[in-house]
């Protein structure tokens, strides 16, 4: 895989709360230079990114119910509609982790579907299951519910919890959702070796702030 192909699999990410206008402008400039799949940013920065990336192939991705997933489904649906109205092409939502652990699967599915329905095929939907907090059984169940709810992707992590993507989790997620659904690895992908390991196990998208280091074959000390 060459640098260009790898770049098209990466969501160039800045989700830290202190990200200012200059940070977003820099992120978008880098995304245009490398032709990354998208920039992944907080909702407050969607309008600016959409303006900066207008007319390019680079998509605007934002996060919903982030990073805890503990908002109500009505709030997540509103966030989704608002983000799309402001220019988001992709939305990465966090599941209700507590309800999953309660085995309240009907709620978890409805929560995901609220975002899928709010996106109304106007945006790609990715479902963050926060693998580091789940048992193997819970990871499988979360992926099954995301697929059943009609989401486009399952995603490992927010990057704000106790761990990120592992090749083993990506393999399990891919085996669970089958060949036709997207699988996004995020959190802890800091080098081309990390990227190759998750791609080999079934990842079709990578979320990283170390995107340039990955493409240039370097190693980043970034935590996301």
Swiss-Prot record:
This protein's pathway: Carbohydrate degradation; 2-deoxy-D-ribose 1-phosphate degradation; D-glyceraldehyde 3-phosphate and acetaldehyde from 2-deoxy-alpha-D-ribose 1-phosphate: step 2/2
Location in or out of the cell: Cytoplasm
Any one Gene Ontology molecular-function term assigned to this protein's record: deoxyribose-phosphate aldolase activity
Chaperone is among the record's keywords: no
GO biological process, one term: deoxyribonucleotide catabolic process
EC number: 4.1.2.4
Gene Ontology CC terms: cytoplasm
Catalytic activity: 2-deoxy-D-ribose 5-phosphate = D-glyceraldehyde 3-phosphate + acetaldehyde
Highest rank taxon of the organism: Bacteria
EC main group: lyase
CDD domains: DeoC
InterPro entries in the record: Aldolase_TIM, DeoC, DeoC/FbaB/LacD_aldolase, DeoC_typeI
Function: Catalyzes a reversible aldol reaction between acetaldehyde and D-glyceraldehyde 3-phosphate to generate 2-deoxy-D-ribose 5-phosphate.
Family note: Belongs to the DeoC/FbaB aldolase family. DeoC type 1 subfamily.
Identification of the protein by name: Deoxyribose-phosphate aldolase
Organism (species): Clostridium perfringens (strain SM101 / Type A)
Taxonomic placement: Bacteria, Bacillati, Bacillota, Clostridia, Eubacteriales
Gene name of the encoded protein: deoC
């Amino acid at each position: 895989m060459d640098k260009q192909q790898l770049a098209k699999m990466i969501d160039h990410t800045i989700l830290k709360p202190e990200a200012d206008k200059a940070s977003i402008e820099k992120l978008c400039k880098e995304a245009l230079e490398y032709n990354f799949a998208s920039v992944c940013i907080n909702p407050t920065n969607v309008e600016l990114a959409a303006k900066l990336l207008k007319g390019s192939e680079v998509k605007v991705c934002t996060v919903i119910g982030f990073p805890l997933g503990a908002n109500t489904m009505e709030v997540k649906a509103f966030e989704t509609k608002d983000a799309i109205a402001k220019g988001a092409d992709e939305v990465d939502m966090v599941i209700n982790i507590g309800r999953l652990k309660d085995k309240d699967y009907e709620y978890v599915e409805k929560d995901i579907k609220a975002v899928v329905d709010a996106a109304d095929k106007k945006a790609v939907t990715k479902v963050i299951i926060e693998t580091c907090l789940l048992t193997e059984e819970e990871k499988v169940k979360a992926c099954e519910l995301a697929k059943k709810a009609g989401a486009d992707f399952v995603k490992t992590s927010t990057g704000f919890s106790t761990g990120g993507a592992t090749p083993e989790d990506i393999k399990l997620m891919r085996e669970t959702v089958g060949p036709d659904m997207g699988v996004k690895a995020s959190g802890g992908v800091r080098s081309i070796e990390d990227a190759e390991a998750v791609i080999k196990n079934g990842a079709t998208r990578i979320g990283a702030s170390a995107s340039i280091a990955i493409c240039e074959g370097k190693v980043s000390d970034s935590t996301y």
